[in-house]
């Protein structure tokens, strides 16, 4: 029985080596002529690339356009910040204070009452910082 297992083990190992060897790539030595012919064919397959230098005017125009885009973004962000907020209600709860259901609303218009642990712990929290 031990001889039979030894024979099966050697057969299995030899099959593993045979499959690994069959999957290896074979490299054949190539002469210079075949390399030259392959390289010329490869160069002809690809389209040629032309490099064009930019003049100073085109660089200035692109910089001006970039500055205009930056300034328009700044103006848009300033418009969002400058909008008026509604006044807080008179009896209100400050941010990060308890705001259970009988308590009044949060003072910050961007804050809302968030409850955890089955509505046992409720606090006023600001959800979005961009508000």
Curated annotation (Swiss-Prot):
Residues 1-20 form the signal peptide. Residues 57-104 are annotated as: Disordered. It comes from the Eukaryota. The keyword Secreted applies. GO terms for molecular function: melanocortin receptor binding; neuropeptide hormone activity. Disulfide bonds join 92-107, 99-113, 106-124, 110-131, 115-122. Keywords: Disulfide bond, Glycoprotein, Knottin, Secreted, Signal. GO terms for cellular component: extracellular space. Glycans are attached at residue 38. GO terms for biological process: hormone-mediated signaling pathway; melanin biosynthetic process; melanosome organization. PROSITE patterns: AGOUTI_1, AGOUTI_2. It is found in: Secreted. Its main location: secreted. Residues 92-131 form the Agouti domain. The presence of a 'disulfide through disulfide knot' structurally defines this protein as a knottin. Involved in the regulation of melanogenesis. The binding of ASP to MC1R precludes alpha-MSH initiated signaling and thus blocks production of cAMP, leading to a down-regulation of eumelanogenesis (brown/black pigment) and thus increasing synthesis of pheomelanin (yellow/red pigment). PANTHER family: AGOUTI RELATED, AGOUTI-SIGNALING PROTEIN. This is Agouti-signaling protein. It comes from Vulpes vulpes (Red fox).
């Amino acid at each position: 029985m031990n001889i039979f297992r030894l024979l099966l083990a050697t057969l299995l190992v030899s099959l593993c080596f045979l499959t690994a060897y069959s999957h290896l790539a074979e490299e054949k030595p190539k002469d210079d002529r075949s390399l030259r012919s392959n390289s010329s064919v490869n160069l002809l397959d690809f389209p040629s690339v032309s490099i064009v230098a930019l003049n100073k005017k085109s660089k200035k125009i692109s910089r001006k356009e970039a500055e205009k885009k930056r300034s328009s973004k700044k103006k848009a962000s300033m418009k969002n910040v400058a909008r008026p907020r509604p006044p807080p209600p008179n009896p209100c709860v400050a941010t990060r204070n308890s705001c259970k259901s009988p308590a009044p609303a949060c003072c910050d218009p961007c804050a809302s009452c968030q409850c955890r642990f089955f509505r046992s712990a409720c606090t006023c929290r600001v959800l979005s910082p961009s508000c």
